[in-house]
Swiss-Prot record:
Binding site for heme 5: C313, C316, H317
Name of the featured protein: Cytochrome c-type protein TorY
Cellular localisation: Cell inner membrane
Residue positions binding heme 1: C39, C42, H43
Gene: torY
Database matches in InterPro entries: Cytochrome_c-type_ET, Membr-bd_4haem_cyt_TorC, Multihaem_cyt_sf, NapC/NirT_cyt_c_N, NapC/NirT_cytc_sf
UniProt-annotated binding residues for heme 2: C68, C71, H72
Transmembrane region(s): 7-27
Family: Belongs to the TorC/TorY family.
Domain of life where this protein originates: Bacteria
Keywords from the named record: Cell inner membrane, Cell membrane, Electron transport, Heme, Iron, Membrane, Metal-binding, Transmembrane, Transmembrane helix, Transport
Residue intervals annotated with topology Cytoplasmic: 1-6
GO molecular function, one term: iron ion binding
Maturation and modification: Binds 5 heme groups per subunit.
Length: 366
């Protein structure tokens, strides 16, 4: 009996030693396959590594570096193991399928890969980001005005890091919107109009030789009998910039640019009045034949603008509500962000006007 017990204890000891050794070896293997050197042993990772080298996560004044695992592998037990298991597909694609073994293939799959990572981070409330960054540790008052606004908004709205910080360590995918959306907008242009109707250009248009009218501008039809409707454009002139008509005094949302003939043809509807900054404004209007098709409902143009926002802007950050900024602030903000996308000038102009017409200081949303 004693012999059997000793044999049993011996087997138990061997099992403990083998199990413990196996556990330690597994831990060692998991740790070793999580370091940056292992990640870079795959040829396909050389491209994202070069992108990462140009970011503050690689080099900064604090001397703190975020390695691959810091961003891509959660620290907690099961999430950690699941991440390691899912990463096995990368080894398969590297050595078997060759899915991203060239620059062209990598770019073709960049959006798919990026969206996979964004989805994982969203699902974990950006857990790997929060292992270094937390709202509790932030001195928000010392941040830039824009960062303060966005971080306060994120805290109140329950947003997570990846909502706004896409493309923080690697280039974001270059997303383009299908041309069908623009063609559909053109197909919805009003085919007939009546006197008193309101119509809205969906692209830069002309009122004869008098003015160039911007997308979204409200035009009132005063004579629909001819081939080209005669429209009324109403706005505000600013002293020193008389060749532009704006939406309202003090609000620099340009409705149209006037030619010399257009300035002469203006009907002035009031005296010059100063705004709070001393700029002089007066009401004015212009009538003429609209030479281009227009929409009968401006909401169609704004729906197109929202698609532009979802396609080009949401790839880098969470949607920013139009009423987050003022009508005068939006142009420079949209221009700065739009420069990082592949939007055309016309697309950026439409999106900017959508933001302006629905800005926080526009009392009646357009």
């Amino acid at each position: 009996m004693r012999g059997k017990k000793r044999i049993g204890l011996l087997f138990l000891l061997i099992a403990v030693v083998v199990g413990g050794g196996g556990f330690l070896m597994a831990q060692k293997a998991l740790h070793k396959t999580s370091d940056t050197a292992f990640c870079l042993s795959c040829h396909s990772m050389s491209k994202p590594f070069e992108e990462y080298q140009g970011t503050v996560h690689f080099s900064n004044q604090k001397g703190i570096r975020a390695e691959c695992a810091d961003c891509h592998i959660p620290k907690s037990g099961m999430d950690y193991l699941f991440a390691k298991l899912k990463a096995s597909k990368d080894i398969y694609h590297e050595f078997v399928s060759g899915k991203i073994d060239s620059d062209d293939k990598f770019e073709a799959h960049r959006q798919e890969m990026a969206e996979t990572v964004w989805k994982e981070l969203k699902a974990t409330d950006s857990a790997t980001c929060r292992s270094c960054h937390s709202f509790d540790a932030m001195d928000i008052a010392s941040q830039s005005e824009s960062a303060q606004k966005m971080h306060n908004k994120a805290q109140k709205g329950g947003e997570t890091c990846i909502d706004c910080h896409k493309g923080i360590a690697h280039f974001p995918p270059e997303i383009k919107m299908d041309d069908n959306a623009a063609h559909e907008l053109e197909s919805q242009a009003a085919t007939s109009v009546t006197n008193g109707a309101h119509i809205y250009p969906f692209k830069t248009s002309r009122i004869g030789e008098l003015a160039t009218v911007n997308p979204g501008t409200d035009l009132t039809v005063v004579d629909a009998s001819g081939k080209q409707p005669i429209v009324l454009l109403q706005g505000y002139q600013m002293q020193g910039s008389e060749n532009t008509l704006y939406l309202a005094a003090g609000q620099r949302l340009a409705l149209a640019t006037l030619s010399e003939e257009g300035i002469k043809a203006l009907t002035v509807n009031g005296e010059w009045q100063a705004d709070e900054y001393g700029n002089q404004w007066r009401q004015a209007s212009l009538q003429g034949a609209l030479t281009d098709p227009a929409l009968a409902d401006r909401k169609l143009l704004w729906q197109y603008a929202e698609k532009l926002d979802d396609t080009y802007c949401a790839g880098c950050h969470a949607p920013i509500a139009a009423d987050h900024y003022t009508v005068n602030a939006w142009p420079s903000i949209a221009k700065g962000m739009g420069a990082r996308t592949s939007m055309s000038e016309n697309e950026l102009d439409i999106l900017t006007r959508y933001f302006q017409y629905n800005a926080k200081d526009i009392t009646e949303k357009q």
